[in-house]
Each structure stands twice: as structure tokens, then as C-alpha cells.
């Protein structure tokens, strides 16, 4: 008799995806972030669900409902901080996952990569809307500033912004719809993630060398299941250290002040994981130019496969490209730092230089390095 694992219509899907899946024998810990993102998503959905049971999406009660969760609901404080810091862990894993894809040339799996870009944008939208829900000062002003950017779109901009707001300013209607979207999007993300996996399993995983591993595969279980469980335990350890010892480390103190449309905070800034894009936005004096640069800074990922000039897939054996890759990482850290600084000298200039470097590295220097390396290897 055939094993039920391999014959049952539902179980064979799970079997082919997580148990008998042929996997490369040499994938490093950089390949753990995919499963960690799955863990993050499940954690966020569960904690979010319990928060939604006590939260009220109304301008008059939103802030106090979050206070009520932290003070009066059993273990409400830990659920709230796991959800807030879980978002930070989610983005750490996301950026590591994308960085891995860039370094090892995983973007040559076009469908998988493009769906990944869509996932990144959806997660960013979800996180932004979630940040508005506690209805603190930074929630309100963050929502006002970011939605207002759409008014830079010619002709339809103002109408578009008022349509998103549901009025003439960020108000009750905005909060209600943001809560509705913030609730539904994680489930949509889960569905897109399944399509992401489906396309990945059409080709099989890449590996650090960038060379096909079809001649030498090992089963996913037990080798990578145990590796993923270890990764998940380390992720949860890091999250709980953050939640239990420094829950407000990555947050903004301004968000402990209830939203007040009559009082603008001195420095409006998003959560740390959006600071690099915010720095690029601020470094261009023109509003429409800034919005376009902001959009392109993320959408540029979709162009990466077209900018690949090397005859080798991975950067493992390409020292010149490696060097530029790590300069790009340093540049992104610089942008993240600048995004959190006030708009004054010398930060403005540093931000502009870092923004120019970001686009120059991706669009010009890295493709050139690929061509140069081909020439050096007489290819």
C-alpha cells in the first residue's frame, strides 16, 4: 500500500513542498529567511487577530483601546509588543531575504522574483497602515504626510488623496478603512506567498555557487526541517528578548501622545524599516521628483534581472561585484541613518550623496562590474 503521505490529495501537496522536496545539499543559513518570513507572518496574523478582538477603529477610542489592551487585557501588553516588534523582525528577515537573492543571483527565477517584489510592496503597505492604527501623534502625522505624497500626481492627485482619506483630512473614515485593509492584507500576503512558493518549486532552490544542483539533491526533511526549526527558535528568541527587555527600543516616543491635528511633531519620521526610502524621498527638493524616486527605489528591484551582465549567476566567485554589493549595503545603512535625522546641514547633503550612490551602484556600477569580470575571465 502507498504511504498516505504520498497518496492523500492534500497531504501529497504538503509532502511535495516540505518533506520529499529535493533540495540542494549546500544551501547556507541565508536560505533560512524564507521559512522565517513564514513564521513571522503566522505570528503577526495570530497576535493581530487577538489585538483586533479588543481594538476599536474609531478616532475617539483607538488610542485608549490600545492603552486598555496593555493595561487591562490578560497578557495584552505582550501581544501588543510582540505584534509591534514582530513587524521589525519581519522586515529584518525581508531585507536579508532580498539581499540574499541579490547576492546569489536568485533573481534569475523571474516569476518567483517578481512575485517577491509584489510581496515586499504589499507587506510595506500593510505595515504602514498598521502604524496608523494606535492613533498616536506619529500615526496621525505619518498617515497625513505619506498619503499627501499622492497629491504630487498631476491632475488627479488632490482628488486621489481626498478619496483615500474619505474626507478633507486624515480622520475617522481614514482610520476605519486602514483597519479594514490592515486586517485583510496579511491573508492576501499569505495567498501570494503560496504562489511565490509554487513558482519556486517549479525550478527548485538556487544555491551559493549559482550552479545547477540537479545532479546532487537531498530530501528537505529531515535536513532542512531541523535547520528551519533552529532558525525559527533563534528568531523567536531574538523577538522575545526585544519584547521583554526593550519593547520601545524601535518605536517612536511621540506615538505615546494621542493624535492631535493642531500640533505637528518637530520630526515626522516613519518606522526604522522605511527610513532608507524616506531619506531618498527627502533628498529631492521637488515633490513629484521625490515621490518618483521613492517609488523607483523599491520598484528598481524588478529591473535587477535585466541589469545582470555577468556570465556567472552568483557573486560567490566575483570579488569586484562583491565589493560593490557591500558598498550598496553600507549605503542603505547610511540612508537609514539619514532618514531619522532632521532636515538640516550636513544631513541633507549626505542624504543626497547616498541617494545618488544607491541608484548609481544598481543601475551603472554593478552591471559594469559584471561586464568587466567577464572580460577578465576572457568570456
From Swiss-Prot:
Molecular function terms in GO for this entry? metal ion binding; ubiquinol-cytochrome-c reductase activity
**Co-factor binding comment:** Binds 2 heme b groups non-covalently.
Respond yes or no to whether keyword Metal-binding is given for this record.
yes
**Keywords noted in UniProt:** Electron transport, Heme, Iron, Membrane, Metal-binding, Mitochondrion, Mitochondrion inner membrane, Respiratory chain, Transmembrane, Transmembrane helix, Transport, Ubiquinone
Q: Where, in this chain's numbering, is heme b b566 bound?
A: 97, 196
* Pfam families (UniProt xref): Cytochrom_B_C, Cytochrome_B
The UniProt entry lists membrane topology as: Multi-pass membrane protein
Q: Where do the TM regions start and end? A: 33-53, 77-98, 113-133, 178-198, 226-246, 288-308, 320-340, 347-367
Q: What protein am I looking at?
A: Cytochrome b
Q: Where in the cell is it found?
A: Mitochondrion inner membrane
Give the protein family: Belongs to the cytochrome b family.
Q: Which gene encodes it?
A: MT-CYB
Under the cellular component aspect of Gene Ontology, which terms does the record hold? mitochondrial inner membrane; respiratory chain complex III
Main localization, broad class: mitochondrion
Question: What does this chain do?
Answer: Component of the ubiquinol-cytochrome c reductase complex (complex III or cytochrome b-c1 complex) that is part of the mitochondrial respiratory chain. The b-c1 complex mediates electron transfer from ubiquinol to cytochrome c. Contributes to the generation of a proton gradient across the mitochondrial membrane that is then used for ATP synthesis.
What positions does the entry give for a ubiquinone binding? Answer: 201
Q: Which organism is it from?
A: Bos javanicus (Wild banteng)
Q: Give the classification, highest ranks.
A: Eukaryota, Metazoa, Chordata, Craniata, Vertebrata
The residues the record assigns to binding heme b b562 are 83, 182
